[in-house]
């Protein structure tokens, strides 16, 4: 064999060996892992666990933020508003934006998967289909009337002055009111927090639910207790998030 032929043979062997690396043990698995890592997660359970559970609780309950595993809340909030809150966050509060277009890390498809997954997993429409839920958003009511509503509907748990009572904590704490939006307060009055024993608007006064005007008035009273915190923006009263 001539030197040139020997070199050609060696080159052919090396080329075949290098080509064969793709079928070596572990090679296909490594490539699959790389491709999986580059594919955005779309499963609701995985998205919720990674993005939401830290604040809203494992299984949608008992977190620092309001429970999402709540059929009354999901019957109250319009789907497009729920999507907006997840995608763009709530300015002036601890709710961040998750959409990439707003500085977060999720695609539009992932945002849709979260919204659809929340409704599919936890809405339970059979429990709320006959319930006339109050309006999600409304103008703030009269604080003076709201003070009377608070005394009748809320003081038994939260104390006469709102600073905490035998069953529940303060609703006028400056740090709390600085962290939440007007709409959050309204949503909490309507939907309650079943995971910690707080009833919804039907359970505050024996024998009847709160009327829509009473809800707006007591929210107006709560908002009137808020004090500005230097350097911290407050969510706009006109922004129903």
Segments the model singles out, each with a brief description of its role:
Residues 22-46, 120-149, 232-241:
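Electrostatic cytochrome c docking/interface patches
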Residues 10-16:
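Sec-dependent N-terminal signal peptides
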Residues 44, 48-58, 114, 146-160, ...:
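The canonical Cys-X-X-Cys-His
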């Amino acid at each position: 064999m001539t030197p040139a032929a020997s070199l050609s043979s060696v080159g052919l062997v090396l080329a075949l060996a290098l080509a064969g690396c793709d079928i070596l043990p572990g090679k296909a698995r490594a490539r699959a892992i790389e491709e999986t890592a580059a594919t955005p997660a779309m499963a609701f359970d995985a998205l919720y666990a990674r993005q939401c559970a830290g604040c809203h609780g494992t299984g949608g309950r008992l977190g620092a933020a309001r429970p999402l595993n709540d059929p009354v809340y999901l019957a109250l909030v319009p789907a497009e508003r729920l999507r907006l809150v997840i995608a763009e966050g709530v300015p002036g509060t601890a709710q961040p934006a998750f959409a990439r277009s707003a500085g977060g890390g999720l695609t539009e498809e992932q945002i849709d998967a979260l919204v659809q997954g929340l409704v599919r997993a936890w809405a339970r429409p059979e429990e709320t289909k006959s319930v006339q839920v109050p309006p999600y958003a409304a103008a703030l009511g009269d604080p003076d009337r709201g003070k009377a509503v608070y005394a009748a509907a809320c003081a038994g748990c939260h104390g006469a002055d709102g600073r905490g009572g035998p069953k529940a904590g303060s609703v006028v704490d400056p740090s709390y009111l600085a962290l939440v939006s007007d709409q959050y307060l309204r949503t909490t009055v309507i939907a309650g927090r079943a995971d910690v024993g707080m009833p919804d608007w039907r359970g505050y006064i024996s024998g009847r639910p709160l009327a829509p005007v009473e809800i707006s008035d007591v929210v107006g009273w709560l908002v009137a207790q808020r004090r500005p915190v230097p350097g911290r923006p407050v969510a706009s009263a006109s922004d129903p998030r």
